[in-house]
Amino acid sequence: MEFKEKLLASHLAFEGSIDFSDSVHQTRLESLKTFEQKGFPSRKDEAWKYTSLNSMLRNDFALFPETETTIEIKKVKKYFLYEIDTYKVVFIDGVYSPFLSDTTHDGLDVCLISAALSKSKYRRFIDTYFNKIADTKDSLTSLNTSFTKEGAYIYIPKSVVAEKPIELIHFSTGKEKSLWLQPRNLIVVDKNAQVQILERHQSLKPHQVVTNSVTEIFAHQDSFLDYYKIQNDFSTASLIDNTSVSYTHLTLPTKRIV
């Protein structure tokens, strides 16, 4: 079975295993249809004319880890921001690790996107922001949307300054010979709010891992967001990253110099 067919075949069971709102279900099904029609990009696509995915797609990727993997904190502590207290959302082989994470709802939201997609109190934010600036015509973005489950949801309310930086960390352990990951992040920084975010992709040993990541960032008027991405993987790892940003830019009348 080709990898595309494996993805399509596994989606029905995956969709039935989660409890999201009807609108999210519909978005996911529409995105799956887009991926089914377009398939994986090839060199015929302008953005991929210098890159072929053919050899990578021959791997028999695991889509869902069979068991949850645990990691001793002493083995990965060096990958956290040194001597700085931070909020953390940590994933191990695509699965959320509550032991390594430090989330919050105290004045701001740093939590899982699965919680935001499934709980009614977040419905207004999801309807306003989820999948609104991601490229819905892109096949890999659509694939990510159709399988959205794990990832971070961050909301910094109006005029709030996050007291601590936020770390989003994805560890791949090598427990699976070949692994396909699809994290989805939704970040909203409201008017006059401030936050620093660091996203890290870290493989712990050489193995075939592909991360098809999608992040949507909304930075409202007079907000400040410092966002850093670190990919510290072995050469056997691949990161496909689609980050979309919506922000406010004002150009006021000025005197021309020339």
Which residue stretches match the model-derived regions?
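Generic hydrophobic alpha-helical segments
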Residues: S42, F224, K255-R256
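Conserved beta-strand/loop scaffold segments within soluble protein domains that form the structured core
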Residues: D109, I113-K121, F125-L250
